[in-house]
C-alpha cells in the first residue's frame, strides 16, 4: 500500500505541471496567444476561472485526463508483447496470503475522480442521463488508453482494465449523485 501511495505521489509530482499546461492550452487555444500576447491571455484565463466554476471544473478535468494518460501510457516502458495478457487481471485477490491486488484497486480508484469532474461539468437534471454519460465516457477513455498501450507497446492491453476503469467511473458518478442529493436536502431544510 505504501508503495502504491509513493507511486501515486511520484506520478502527481512529475505530471502536475505538464497537465496544467495541457489543460490551459486546450481551454484557451493557440490563436488567443497570437492575437493578444501571453501576458494578456494569462490574465484573461485566471479571471475567467475565478468568475466561472464550469471552467475551473473543465481545467481540473483536463488536467486529470492528462495525468491519467501520462501514468498509463507515457510513463510506461516499452513492452514487446502488449497482447500477452489480454484476458488477465480479473482476480481481486492475488493469493490468500498477499491480499488485494493493488492494480485492480488502482484501476477502479483511478476513474472515480474522472467521473466526479465529468459530472461537475455537466448541467443536467436527469440522473439516468448523467450516469449513462459517465459510464460511457469512462469506458471510452479507458478504451483509448488501452488502445494506445497496444499501438505504442506501452503496457499490456487488458479487457479487465477497461471493465475496472468503467466501474470506477460508475462509482464516481454515484458518489457525485449521492453528495448532490445530500446537499440538496440540506438546502431544503435550510429554506424551511
Language model regions located:
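Bulky hydrophobic segments
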Residues: 1-153, 159, 173-192
Amino acid at each position: 500500500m505504501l508503495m502504491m501511495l509513493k507511486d501515486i505521489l511520484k506520478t502527481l509530482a512529475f505530471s502536475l505541471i505538464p497537465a496544467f499546461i495541457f489543460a490551459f492550452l486546450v481551454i484557451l487555444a493557440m490563436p488567443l496567444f497570437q492575437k493578444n500576447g501571453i501576458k494578456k491571455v494569462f490574465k484573461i484565463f485566471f479571471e475567467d476561472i475565478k468568475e466561472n466554476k464550469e471552467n475551473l471544473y473543465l481545467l481540473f478535468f483536463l488536467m486529470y485526463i492528462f495525468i491519467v494518460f501520462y501514468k498509463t501510457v507515457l510513463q510506461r516502458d516499452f513492452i514487446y508483447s502488449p497482447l500477452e495478457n489480454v484476458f488477465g487481471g480479473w482476480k481481486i485477490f492475488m493469493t490468500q496470503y498477499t491480499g488485494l491486488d493493488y492494480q485492480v484497486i488502482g484501476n477502479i480508484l483511478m476513474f472515480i475522480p474522472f467521473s466526479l469532474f465529468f459530472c461537475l461539468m455537466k448541467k443536467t437534471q436527469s440522473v439516468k442521463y448523467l450516469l449513462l454519460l459517465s459510464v460511457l465516457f469512462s469506458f471510452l477513455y479507458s478504451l483509448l488508453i488501452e488502445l494506445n498501450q497496444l499501438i505504442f507497446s506501452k503496457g499490456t492491453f487488458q479487457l479487465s482494465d477497461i471493465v475496472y476503469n468503467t466501474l470506477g467511473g460508475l462509482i464516481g458518478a454515484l458518489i457525485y449523485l449521492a453528495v448532490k442529493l445530500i446537499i440538496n436536502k440540506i438546502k431544503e431544510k435550510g429554506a424551511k
